[in-house]
Curated annotation (Swiss-Prot):
EC number: 3.4.25.1
The protein's name in its UniProt record: Proteasome subunit beta
GO biological process, one term: proteasomal protein catabolic process
Gene3D superfamilies from the UniProt entry: Glutamine Phosphoribosylpyrophosphate, subunit 1, domain 1
Claim: Protease is one of the keywords in the record: yes
Species name: Mycobacteroides abscessus (strain ATCC 19977 / DSM 44196 / CCUG 20993 / CIP 104536 / JCM 13569 / NCTC 13031 / TMC 1543 / L948)
Family membership: Belongs to the peptidase T1B family.
Any one cellular-component term (Gene Ontology): cytoplasm
Record text on activity regulation: The formation of the proteasomal ATPase ARC-20S proteasome complex, likely via the docking of the C-termini of ARC into the intersubunit pockets in the alpha-rings, may trigger opening of the gate for substrate entry. Interconversion between the open-gate and close-gate conformations leads to a dynamic regulation of the 20S proteasome proteolysis activity.
Chief location bin: cytoplasm
Length: 292
């Protein structure tokens, strides 16, 4: 999103906010400078096909919190456009998003959503409830529907810690959205979006255990992204040569924090070592069977 000094300068400085009682920054922007919103206008099929796309995002709840993680690859048709894009973003003290789809739209969604939450808190003096945060992100997704119909699709996952839940151990929340802005709180404790989501969810389904700790959730997320990359060319797996690994954010009663890269690298190396050993044993078994 490019902010221009003259974009909302048709009135005296400061007059816009004094004249507006909108607690939604996106609605204020839509009224004052709609050209600054993501994905306005029309794009040709050729342009859309050549835009970088990012996948895959996974999210899991654990005892006392929630974790979201994403791979690092963005593709442009059959090319790898970027190997180290960060697809998960902290949006306020107790929420984070991961957005799969057209990379530029996804990045702008995350930035605009973070401003939306901050804008509300400054005007109202309180943070939105978690359901309120989901509704605000839903409105942004719905506002992108026209662009989505042209192929500029961005599908988010919202995760957060619900401060209104009296039971802190089950306060982790995952919300999925459709392209029309409909949202759903996931009751299974996990979800994935993006082109590799089918493979990632299949992996999580076998590995996920409700009530696990944050470290276990991180291990499941990394392995799920590894499985997604194994079958989906648009998803990037851990790259030991370039030292590029998934990124992750965890949220608990203490707030949202990025998982240190060293922790993710260690788990990724353990997953690769385990898979390498399993493949070696399978090859040895086939070889011994062939000799007999």
């Amino acid at each position: 999103m490019i902010w221009r000094d003259d974009a909302i300068a048709s009135q005296p400085a400061g007059q816009h906010f004094r004249n507006s009682h909108l607690s939604s920054f996106s609605e204020y922007l839509r009224a004052q400078a709609p050209e600054l919103l993501p994905a306005l206008g029309k794009a040709s099929a050729d342009v859309i096909g050549n835009l970088p796309h990012g996948t895959t995002i996974v999210a899991l709840t654990y005892r006392g919190g929630v974790l979201i993680a994403g791979d690092r690859r963005a593709t442009q048709g059959n090319y790898i456009a970027n190997r180290d894009i960060d697809k998960v973003q902290i949006t306020d003290n107790y929420s984070a998003t991961g957005i799969a789809g057209t990379a530029a739209i996804a990045v702008e969604f995350a930035r605009l959503y973070a401003v939306e939450l901050e804008h509300y808190e400054k005007l109202e003096g309180v943070q939105l409830t978690f359901n309120g945060k989901a509704n605000r992100l839903s409105a942004l997704v719905r506002g992108n529907l026209a662009a989505a119909m042209q192929g500029l699709v961005a599908v988010p996952l919202l995760v957060g810690y619900d401060l209104d839940d009296p039971n802190g151990e089950t306060a982790g929340r995952i919300v999925s959205f459709d392209v029309a802005g409909g949202w759903h709180v996931e009751s299974d404790g996990y979800q994935a979006v993006g082109s590799g989501s089918v493979f990632a969810k299949s992996s999580i389904k076998k590995l996920y255990r409700p009530g696990g700790d944050a470290l276990t959730a991180l291990a499941v997320a990394v392995e799920a992204l590894y499985d997604a990359a194994d079958d989906d060319s648009a998803t990037g797996g851990p790259d030991l040569v370039r030292r590029v690994f998934p990124t992750a954010i965890r949220i608990d009663s203490g707030g949202a924090v990025r998982v240190p890269e060293a922790d993710i690298e260690r788990i990724a190396r353990e997953v690769i070592a385990k898979r390498t050993e399993a493949a070696r044993e399978e090859a040895d078994l086939r070889e011994s069977g062939g000799d007999s």
